[in-house]
Regions:
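The feature marks proteins involved in alpha-glucan
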Residues: 20-35, 67-158
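Carbohydrate-binding surface patches
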Residues: 30-37, 42-45, 588-629
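Beta-strand-rich binding/interaction modules
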Residues: 38, 43-56, 60, 625-642
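Conserved, mostly hydrophobic/aromatic
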Residues: 38, 142, 182, 261, ...
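C-terminal beta-strand-rich structural cap/linker in extracellular carbohydrate-active enzymes
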Residues: 40, 82-86, 650-669
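Conserved alpha/beta catalytic core and glycan-binding cleft of carbohydrate-active enzymes
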Residues: 113-114, 356-357, 361-525, 529-530, ...
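Substrate-binding/active-site clefts of carbohydrate-active enzymes
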Residues: 145-166, 170-178, 183-334, 347-362, ...
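Glycan-recognition and catalytic regions of carbohydrate-active enzymes
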Residues: 446, 507, 516-536, 548, ...
Length: 669
């Protein structure tokens, strides 16, 4: 019995080792033949590949039995299969494999195309915008539909191509952001791509019906989802393309988007969701190698650390290799400049470090960050997971700071509870965020809201933010917790002018804290337009009427956009705000004594070789103006009373500075 167990263990390890000598090249095309390879159990009764004419519907043109050779199931089909579609079938339902690079509508079948024909003109000359340090990044998180669906002059509303249009590029460049974090843009399962465009539906339905049968016309309601429902990880989402039926279209248009942003000096960061799949039964992982890619609990149930019904097992050799190859593929094929790992706390540390190491070998400037938490208990030791507390073991990888987020606006658990902006004593938590979650002698860790000890080795390992797609946007949160707590159904547009002015003051103050902190600044798209979602806490499948950006706000509240723009410029022009090194932060950043509700700090002695010798930032959340003692000197104010001007607004002399209620003061000498 012992010999049998050892033999089976040896065979299993040999299978994985042999399979790992291959990349996930499940389909290799040439005009003479096409070769298929699949990682699937050696003891599978039957593994087949089916060839189809269409991406959806119709019977298979060919069905070929695959043979098990050297740890993989393989088959070769002679002849030119360009333009055909294929699926794998091992008795659990057909699927396009786990590493399809092109698919038909809804991702049910993989497509055989020539990838070189999906490159836009001059693609070979496309280059990543220069980024010397993650501290130099200004990350702008956006959803394709949110950004462009309500823009009157947009030609490609809700599509990849919207980000190639001049209005979009001009807005982003003027604002000053230099990295776009796009919400999931791989092929996901929660939007039916056949019901996006009634004309396309009619055209393709007509082609698939018997001669003489005319399909009924159909009008489709708009569909919306954030896309955290992975199906095909390595193919762009079809609903963001102009034709989801044509496999090459989504690929070409995604590349055109990247190319346009790169020409504008803007990096592209992909939101990747390797921690779970849309479901288990229908997933490509499960249909090719049942239960291998998922974690299970001690009692045999599927673990649910993602909160979505399952969690993948990144520590298993082939899941780890899948993640490594997928990241590399997006970098090589689509020129992606960074990756945001959804629920990074579900992934093991070793896999994350191997990804960082691999990426460094290609381009060390590619930025990696993620959520340093999970959404439930993972079936893996917490000390080995990519949690925020373990960031010191993952150098070169950053995590979101819920400390600074919740210090500013209030706890995630209750939208009606305020934070520092609403008068709560969270000064130490805010200080912890300002230094970038590193060890600093003036931060009293016992008073920090969540972290028991510093979790970042370098400040560039902390994402500084006050809002993102999750939870309420900043305007809604301020409405619910500070401005109009007594009437939770009211909306920003219904406020009187006095309350609107107060909300705007707090909004600008919050972002000043974010953009003058030493972490990597991150903002939700539309915050520069006073975006609101009508109070919706979780808008993942809410309609466009909730999620769209209201572009008319740019004209209604020009002072808000101007402040955001000038705040970003201030950070970009002055290295003191982005030192990028923990020792430099401890050397040059000193907190000043300040009254309750105020946080003040001094960036001293030409920090980061800044042109300004001393910079003092005073953040006042209280409803009264406050006095703060400062080093005696002659100062120029560049931020005061909701206005920023680097050339100077006024001068101050002496050893005291007065900052207006609910505002920031930035001065220098």
């Amino acid at each position: 019995m012992k010999k049998l167990v050892l033999f089976l263990l040896f065979m299993t390890m040999t299978t994985f080792a042999t399979a790992q000598n291959f990349r996930f090249d499940e389909m290799t095309y040439s005009p003479e033949k096409t070769t298929f390879k699949l990682f699937a159990p050696a003891d599978a009764k039957s593994v087949k590949v089916r060839i189809y004419k269409e991406g959806l519907g119709g019977k298979a043109l060919k069905t070929i039995k695959m043979q098990y050779v050297d740890g993989l199931w393989t088959a070769t089909v002679k002849g030119d299969l360009l333009g055909r579609f294929y699926t794998f079938d091992m008795g659990h339902g057909e699927c396009p494999g786990v590493f399809a690079k092109a698919v038909g509508v809804n991702g049910k079948r993989a497509a055989i195309i020539a990838m070189t024909q999906t490159n836009p003109e001059e693609w070979e000359n496309d280059q990543r915008p220069i980024c010397k340090s993650p501290a130099d990044l200004v990350v702008y998180e956006m959803h394709h539909r949110d950004f462009s669906i309500a823009r009157e002059d947009a030609q490609y509303k809700g599509k990849f191509l919207a980000l190639t249009e001049s209005w979009a590029i001009d807005h982003l460049k003027t604002l000053g952001v230099n990295a776009i974090h796009i919400l999931p843009s791989y092929d996901y399962g929660s939007v039916d791509e056949t019901r996006i465009d009634s004309d396309l539906y009619y055209e393709h339905a007509y082609e698939s019906l018997p001669e003489g049968v005319i399909p009924a016309r159909a009008d489709f309601s708009p569909q919306y989802n954030w896309g955290y429902d992975p199906v095909n990880y390595n193919v762009p989402e079809g609903s963001y393309s102009t034709d989801p039926y044509e496999p090459a279209t989504r690929i070409l248009e995604f590349k055109q988007m990247v190319q346009a942003l790169h020409k504008a000096g803007i990096r592209v960061i992909l939101d990747v969701v390797y921690n779970h799949t849309y479901d288990i039964e229908h997933s490509n992982f499960q249909r090719t190698y049942p239960d291998y890619y998922y974690r299970k609990t001690a009692d045999g149930a599927y673990s649910n650390g993602s909160g979505c019904g399952n969690e993948t097992a990144s520590e298993k050799p082939m899941m780890r290799q899948f993640m490594l190859e997928s990241v590399k593929y997006w970098m090589d094929e689509y020129h992606i400049d960074g990756f945001r790992f959804d629920l990074m706390g579900c992934h093991d540390i070793e896999t994350m470090n191997q990804i960082r190491q691999m990426v460094d070998g290609i381009d060390p400037s590619v930025f990696i960050y993620g959520e340093g938490w999970s959404a439930g208990q993972c079936a893996y030791p917490s000390e080995q997971l990519g949690l925020k507390a373990n960031i010191p073991q993952m150098l070169g990888i950053a995590a979101f700071s819920d400390e600074i987020r919740d210090a500013l606006r209030g706890p995630f658990s209750d939208d009606t509870k305020p934070g520092w902006l609403g008068g709560v004593n969270e000064e130490e938590s805010l200080k912890f965020g300002i230094v970038g979650a590193i060890r600093h002698p003036q931060v009293k860790m016992k008073k920090v809201n969540y972290a028991e000890k510093p979790w970042a080795v370098e400040p560039t390992q902390m994402m500084s933010y006050v809002s993102c797609h999750d939870d309420m946007c900043l305007v809604d949160r301020l409405m619910a917790s500070v401005i109009d707590k007594s009437n939770h159904n009211s909306q920003f547009s219904t406020l009187n002018s006095q309350l609107k002015e107060e909300l705007i003051r707090l909004d600008l103050l919050a972002q000043t804290a974010v953009f003058t902190s030493q972490g990597v600044p991150f903002m939700l798209s539309g915050e520069e337009l006073l975006r609101d979602k009508k109070g919706v806490h979780n808008s993942f499948e809410s309609p466009d009427s909730i999620n769209h950006l209201d572009w008319t706000n740019k004209e209604k509240y020009p002072q808000v956009f101007e402040y955001y723009k000038n705040l970003i410029d201030l950070r970009k022009h002055h290295p003191a705000f982005r030192l990028g090194n923990a020792d430099l932060v401890r050397k040059h950043l000193e907190f000043l004594q300040a009254p309750k509700g105020v946080v003040a700090f001094h960036l001293k002695n030409y920090a980061g070789r800044d042109d300004w010798r001393n910079i003092i930032v005073i953040l006042n959340a209280s409803k009264q103006s406050q006095q703060v003692n400062i080093p005696n000197g002659n100062y120029i104010a560049v931020c005061r009373d909701g206005v920023i001007n680097e050339k100077g607004l006024c001068t101050l002399e002496g050893n005291q500075a007065e900052v207006s209620a609910q505002s920031a003061l930035i001065i220098h000498d």
